Structure formats: structure tokens, C-alpha cells
A protein has these predicted regions:
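Gly/Gly-Pro-rich "capping" loops immediately C-terminal to redox-active cysteine motifs
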Residues: 37-39, 48-84, 89-90
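Electrostatic cytochrome c docking/interface patches
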Residues: 23-42, 110-115
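Bacterial N-terminal signal peptides that target proteins for export
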Residues: 2-16
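Cys/His-enriched microdomains
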Residues: 45
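Hydrophobic alpha-helical targeting segments used for export or membrane insertion
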Residues: 14-26
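Residues within well-ordered alpha-helical secondary structure of globular protein domains
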Residues: 42, 82, 105-108
Length: 115
């Protein structure tokens, strides 16, 4: 049996608590997911124009098939903010909250992790 001095307990609890917090994520609420789906199909240009995503009924012909890519929400956010390849940036077109909604919708629809 290990002997633990009282001085180390607060630090151990703090580190353990931070470890637990780092592994948790905030689930998107259903209204945010629904808004993300709507934006995916209605933005100009619409994500659905280029990307295939079964959950959105999208059969794009240009960009990656998101159902196969299974990209997480952070990667979708980076692509929306900065653009990637021929995909334009949406930073000047939609709010950060709307970008988050699209990112979480795509991550959930593909089974990828969501922040």
C-alpha cells in the first residue's frame, strides 16, 4: 500500500480534475445541429454544391465526400474560417456561431468527434 503525504493530495486532485475536463466535450444541442444542416444546404455557395453528405441529402461532385472523410468539427471550422484548396473562406459570410453549427453538424453526421 502506498503512503500519500497530505501535501500532494491537492495537486493530485487538481491534475486528475484537469485530465477529466480535457477528455470531455460539450454536446451540441439539437437546434444547433438543425441550424448547421440548414446552413450546409443553403449557404452561398452551399456546402452541398461541392460536398457529398448523406445526412444533408447532398451529392456534390467537386469536394471530398464528407461521409468517407469523417472529419472532426475542428477541421471543419478551420476550413470554413480559412478556406482550403478551391473551397472559399466563409469568415466574412457567416457568424462564428453559424460556422460552429455547420462544423458540429458535419462532425455528428459523419460520426467524427465534436468539440
Amino acid at each position: 500500500m502506498a503512503v500519500v503525504t497530505w501535501r500532494w493530495l491537492p495537486r493530485a486532485w487538481a491534475v486528475g480534475g484537469l485530465t477529466l475536463l480535457a477528455g470531455t466535450s460539450v454536446a451540441a444541442d439539437p437546434s444547433e445541429i438543425a441550424r448547421g444542416k440548414l446552413l450546409f444546404t443553403t449557404l452561398q455557395p452551399a456546402c452541398a454544391t461541392c460536398h457529398t453528405l448523406q445526412a444533408a441529402g447532398a451529392e456534390g461532385q467537386i469536394g471530398p465526400v464528407l461521409d468517407e472523410l469523417k472529419t472532426d468539427a475542428d477541421r471543419v471550422l478551420r476550413a470554413l474560417r480559412n478556406g482550403i484548396g478551391v473551397m472559399p473562406s466563409y469568415a466574412e459570410k457567416i457568424s462564428p456561431q453559424d460556422m460552429q453549427a455547420v462544423a458540429r453538424f458535419v462532425a455528428q453526421a459523419t460520426g467524427a468527434a465534436s468539440p
